[in-house]
Amino acid sequence: MKRPGRWHVRDPEYVLQEQKKGIKPMEANNENPIIQLVGLGKQFQTMNGPVTALEDINLEIRYGEVFGIIGLSGAGKSTLVRCINYLEVPTSGKVVFEGKNLSVMKDREKRLARQSMGMIFQQFNLLSQRNVLQNVCFPLEIAGVSKAEAKKRAEELLTLVGLEVRMKAYPAQLSGGQKQRVAIARAMATNPKVLLCDEATSALDPNTTKSILELLKKINREMGITVIVITHEMAVIEAICDRVAIIDHSHIAEVGNVSDIFSGPKSDIGRQLILGDVAEQNLSFGNSRQIRIIFDGRESSEPVIANMVLACKVPVNIMHADTRDIEGKAMGQMIIQLPEDDTDAGRICNYLKTANVKFEEVR
């Protein structure tokens, strides 16, 4: 098979042939991050004075990974992603893309760097007077690609995202999920190395969200594109991301592998995002002590609680439990109410420690 040119999508058949030859898609690289944010800050000037949206942000995003940025509304996550591709110019610090500081680049260099970063949004931003094929061709037209080559590239991408039979449809004739697939194809038109996703699934129903996340994961794995996901939903992070940064009040609260953050969040905002409304719901149970037990795959297939009750001869009240698929393994959490008697509570905690089951006291 002929090697794809500049505007050709890396289709699964081509990737398979590369793998047979020992050539692998771009993988996460610890030593050479594709994006570095160093002391990044952003202020907006208002009539009432400056407002700080970001302060002293330091992050490294590796080649070929799916990196999540999560936070509550107003935390600064959307401003952060817009600073990465210079839709917003940082007030301080620097953005380093493939070893080069964007702030000192000449306009042409900066434009080429930005073409290497595709972006999709919550509201799709499709051109209503253009059909699906024309929407995907649009960035290629701006880049000076010939109409024939742009059409060929757009058709390849629309086939990749599963819309080959909807190329002549207009945005008003599409569902929300189909519109986002068009937006993804358009963002990939210039063959980017990074795909920025700003709340890309927030306006979609759960089933459509799942299909879009599966598509993003497919693009990452088969084409080696680094994907950066901005969201306020922990379920999105757990479904697709390798690592995550939690942003709170304009600062990075913590960064780590998704499974590590789930197992042992170090920040209050991390615990809040993982537990969701569970902590608030449990306030109705009075002042009793509660612990959160974390199951990491091994324990999720064993009767840990049943064995604990039999061994300690102490009944417990299960207040919440759920399981999740994180990084390809079953993980879960359970919040139980400890007995009021300190001796009984101590026996339960000692049993869990002996059994090497992770837990933390949540109140």
Predicted stretch roles:
Residues N48-V51, L102-G118, K147-A148, I261-P265:
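ABC ATPase NBD coupling module
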Residues N85:
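Helix-to-loop junction immediately C-terminal to a conserved catalytic motif
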Residues K100-N101, C137, E141, A148-V165:
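Conserved ABC ATPase "signature" region
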Residues R130-C137:
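Short coil-to-helix segment of the ABC ATPase nucleotide-binding domain corresponding to the Q-loop/switch region
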Residues A169-A172, T190, C197:
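Conserved signature/switch motifs of ABC ATPase nucleotide-binding domains
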Residues V255-G256, G264:
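ABC ATPase "signature
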